Swiss-Prot record:
The lineage of its organism: Eukaryota, Fungi, Dikarya, Ascomycota, Pezizomycotina. GO terms for biological process: methylation. It comes from Pestalotiopsis fici (strain W106-1 / CGMCC3.15140). Induction: The cluster is expressed in rice fermentation medium. Three regulators are located in the cluster (ptaR1, ptaR2 and ptaR3), suggesting that the production of pestheic acid is controlled by a complex regulatory mechanism. It holds the Pfam family Methyltransf_12. Belongs to the methyltransferase superfamily. Pathway: Secondary metabolite biosynthesis. This is Methyltransferase ptaI. The keyword Transferase applies.
Length: 339
């Protein structure tokens, strides 16, 4: 057993493996993750301006889990100033190298977990009670929801907006799409298995929480009606699970959970294979998986050849090393107004 002076290392999904990486890693991360469309952020802005009170609605936004600030920068089109927070100091340090200098002038970066934001060292003018919109980009499954939501309420002004979104695996379209999607799933599931064990480790509660949130399409995330109102849940391409790999990638069982308030919340499901559509070749698939599962190649060791063989199958099914195919994604967006 670990001693009190030498506690067990807690490995969490993505976060632990991403620590210590510099500008090159984060540049590749930005390039190889999906790129949310301008219309997606316009939808968030439209909700924001049509709910809550109208005072100072476009002054301050805060991007939680900002990484190197690429999504935070997109918010500058809609807000005067954007705060970006993250637990990863190296990710924050990469922002000036990856973003335009004129954007950096209108941004503030803060090292903090989401759960600790209420006590973080955020300048008063852009901190507690001053924030018009909080955007939680792709990190919500990792968070302690009750603690994080309490921190978000502390930052938001009354009538401010909380926007949470999450995307998962690529969905291949067109000819032989079933074959392509099955091959992707086999690859991603084997990659996830290289990271085992999860169960019985200090980080297991976070692994379980993340798996539950993803397998539930974020329906496991509740909004307290005493604290939030006008909750809307958008679900694009919900016919595909909001997970990066199948359940066989885990060493524990997880089932979907629905904690929605069906009497007050609105859920909108949209099937649209052109949503966030991009053209991907085999290299882009491999780079995407590198960004989702950092360091998996080292964890795989000699077994990496199993994945290489599957990549070869997928490359052939795509039509060759340079052949591309349109992909879309399952995406969930949660919107709520602070009471």
């Amino acid at each position: 057993m670990p001693s009190p002076t030498n506690p067990a290392k807690v490995e969490t999904p993505f976060t632990t493996a991403a620590l210590g990486n510099g500008v090159d890693f984060w540049k590749a991360y930005v390039e190889n993750r999906p790129h949310p469309s301008d219309s997606f952020f316009e939808l968030i802005s439209e909700y924001h301006h049509s709910h809550g009170d109208s005072a100072a609605q476009s002054a301050i936004a805060h991007d939680v889990g900002t990484g190197p600030g690429n999504i935070a920068e997109k918010l500058l089109r809609h807000f005067d100033h954007v705060v970006g927070s993250d637990v990863n100091e190296q990710a924050l340090a990469a922002a000036p190298a990856l973003l335009p200098a004129d954007s950096i002038k209108r941004m503030t970066f803060v090292k903090s977990s989401a759960e600790d934001l209420a006590s973080a060292n955020i300048p008063e003018s852009v901190g507690k009670g001053q924030t018009d919109l909080i955007l939680v980009s792709e990190c919500i499954p990792l968070l302690d929801i009750s603690k994080a939501f309490a921190a978000f309420r502390a930052l938001l002004r009354p009538g401010g907006t909380l926007a949470i979104y999450f995307y998962s695996r690529p969905i291949f379209t067109g000819d032989n799409e079933a074959e392509l999607n099955q091959l992707y799933d086999r690859i991603a599931t084997r990659v996830c298995q290289f990271l085992l064990p999860f169960k019985g480790t200090p980080g297991f509660p976070i692994h379980y929480r993340a798996a539950e949130a993803m397998s539930s399409g974020l329906d496991s995330i509740p909004f307290d009606p005493e604290a939030w109102q006008d909750v809307v849940r958008y679900k694009w391409n919900a016919d595909v699970p909001l997970t990066f790999n199948s359940k066989e990638g885990y060493d524990f069982e997880v089932e979907p959970v629905d904690r929605r308030d069906h009497s007050t919340e609105i859920t909108k499901e949209i099937t649209d294979r052109d949503f966030w559509a991009e053209e991907w070749d085999i290299g882009r698939v491999a780079s995407f998986l590198d960004s989702v599962f950092p360091n998996y190649r080292n964890k795989a060791g000699d077994k990496f050849e199993e994945v290489q063989s599957l990549f070869t199958e997928l490359e052939t099914a795509l039509g060759g090393p340079k052949a591309t195919r349109k992909v879309s994604f399952p995406v969930v967006l949660l919107l709520a107004t602070r009471k």
